[in-house]
From Swiss-Prot:
Protein name, per record: 17.6 kDa class I heat shock protein 2
Entry similarity comment: Belongs to the small heat shock protein (HSP20) family.
Keyword Acyltransferase: no
Subcellular location: Cytoplasm
Listed PANTHER family: HEAT-SHOCK PROTEIN 20 FAMILY MEMBER
Organism (species): Arabidopsis thaliana
Length: 153
């Protein structure tokens, strides 16, 4: 627990003396964290969970309101998983009066460097209820051969 109170942490881990802290105060952060940018950050900063099972690496991205046609999953350079997409702004009709516009729009791109022990040719993606699931199967790791050596002497 820090001896100095933090006014900028928003309930996240913050410690100015910890070099590995996730949230050290940034004076320029306030310029980009207006309520407007926070509202639009839902799609622009798509949240992704990455878990590893014994069989695969599984990525889950929350993409509420997006259709699968608006999302792309690609493998770059044989080692980078790229998830990208775009939500378009609804067309305005000159006869309509908008009282509130809160749904986010914009583009997003997330990249993840994959480990060497994966089967790039067997990557699968599925989208259900606004959640994209990308499964990257693991390649079987070859167990090292152990050979006993006789000690002479």
């Amino acid at each position: 627990m820090s001896m100095i109170p933090s006014f900028f942490n928003n309930n996240r881990r913050s410690n100015i003396f910890d070099p590995f802290s996730l949230d050290v105060w940034d004076p320029f952060k306030e310029l980009t964290s207006s309520s407007l940018s926070r509202e639009n950050s839902a799609i622009v900063n798509a949240r992704v969970d990455w878990r590893e099972t014994p069989e695969a690496h599984v990525f889950k991205a929350d993409l509420p309101g997006l259709k699968k046609e608006e999302v792309k999953v690609e493998i770059e350079e044989d080692s980078v998983l790229k998830i990208s997409g775009e939500r378009h702004v609804e067309k305005e009709d000159k006869n309509d009066t908008w009282h509130r516009v809160e749904r986010s729009s914009g583009q997003f791109t997330r990249r993840f460097r994959l480990p060497e022990n994966v089967k790039m040719d067997q990557v699968k993606a599925a989208m259900e209820n606004g959640v994209l699931t990308v499964t990257v199967p693991k390649a079987e790791t070859k167990k090292a051969d152990v050979k006993s050596i006789q000690i002479s002497g």
